Amino acid sequence: MANTAWLAFQKGDIASIGIDVSIASEYVNSSRAVFTGDDFVGSMQLQSNVEALKAREGENEDKEILGYVDFRKAISLAMNRDSYCATCTTASKAGFGLFNGMHYYDVENGGVYRNEDVAKQVLCEVYGVNVADYESLDAAYAAITGYNPELAKTLVTSAYAQAKADGVIDDDDKVTLVVGTAADTESTRRTYEFIKAALEAMVVGTPLEGRMVVKFDASFGDNWANDFRAGAYDICTGGWSGAAWDPGYFLLAYLSPQYMYSQAWDTSAETLAYDPDGEGTEYEELEMSLIDWYNCLNGASGAAYNWAEGQVENDFRLGIIAQLEKAVLLKYYSVPLYNYFSAQLRSFKIEYGSNTYNTFMGYGGIRYITYNYDDAAWEKVKESFDYKA
């Protein structure tokens, strides 16, 4: 990390600097390290366009197996998210859902979607954690790892058998998947190598052992996301931030063709049956397409119901948000990997107004920064500090 900004920070000339993953192990335990949560959820996106997959197959190559949900689920379960975060990020934490702890459904009262029971229950169901095996829902939720390599192998075998029966793959075909990105950098290479190793390990002991080929293509530049949506390659890493105070609206990123990475998945044809008021009497079980549920949740023009914020109780909306999150996750086109945290070193010259990050106020802003040294005193000592301590 020998760049100009890093050298300037070490000399005491700038107040803070981000910690690069290449030096994270040396500095993450520093007394001057600051870790800040973010609403960004980083995911691995798996190609949904089976026709595009087939069109890009070479001789004795298969890509269409990615169209089988068992195979995509296997990929999800083959990802050790804790290891991914330690290898490919500086300070991010394993992520399992479309939302993290920075998504508020009730801003006035500090209500965080991910902290609600319905949101925890959904992730337990998606990742096969039986709540009855634990003392509480919270204990079951805390036990989620998203990593089950043995079940992943079983699912690979199942998907292979089905693909072979369907005439999609032959015994001499290799599964060839391309991880695409915008540029060839140390960071993108690190991510690619992690995914490659995970997929190769996933097929050991299955009919695809020795037949998994994972390639790297950094030629997509600024159009990498749209190229992926158009079916130009097989795997990318990307995600979404924004609408942190409206998780119901945020679902648009995963359900609307205008935004979703999995554009070949028709959410107007995928249905969800659900009773939105549970034991209530106003609604029986309703069955609508996913995008229709979304439109009702957000009070869209022409929607069958108006369940927008302020029109119904929060608990009513939370149940729908949770069901839509579950529906997206169970397709395994978007595989959450991490909840983004940034890591910075703060100069010994300054102190923030608060050491606890607040999504509305940050660390207090410039107004509340205090100084341990004036400029003259700082000049005398600024190069004497050890930022590893």
Set out the residue ranges of the language-model regions:
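A bilobed periplasmic-binding-protein/Venus flytrap-type ligand-binding module shared by bacterial periplasmic
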Residues: 39-71, 87, 338-341, 349
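Loop/turn elements at helix/coil->beta-strand transitions in domains of secreted/extracellular proteins
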Residues: 12-15, 70-73, 80-82, 173-176, ...
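Solvent-exposed, polar/charged alpha-helical surfaces in well-ordered, non-transmembrane soluble domains
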Residues: 3-7, 11, 25, 69, ...
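Second-shell loop/turn segments in exported
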Residues: 5, 56-66, 71-74, 137-145, ...
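Extracytoplasmic/secreted cell-surface and envelope-processing proteins
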Residues: 5-7, 25-29, 44, 54-57, ...
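Ligand/substrate-recognition segments at binding pockets and active sites
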Residues: 1-3, 8, 126-242, 342
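Extracellular/periplasmic solute-recognition and catalytic clefts
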Residues: 1-56, 82, 86-87, 93
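Detector for C-terminal structural segments
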Residues: 76-125, 183-197, 228-389
